[in-house]
């Protein structure tokens, strides 16, 4: 499952960042790397971007970018 697939109020652990180059580095710099716990806070009114919380930091990502972050959902 990717961050783009998750709904507000759901959470999980980042398993993999599958983007390459600048995009992958940008996601890692925002704190999205394997092992990090993330929580989907909300979607914007039009559904894009999505706001997430990663280790106490709030980040807004376009769904296009969120597709590159693979997450293991918390059950």
Model-derived segments and spans:
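Compact, glycine-rich, soluble single-domain proteins
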Residues: 1-75
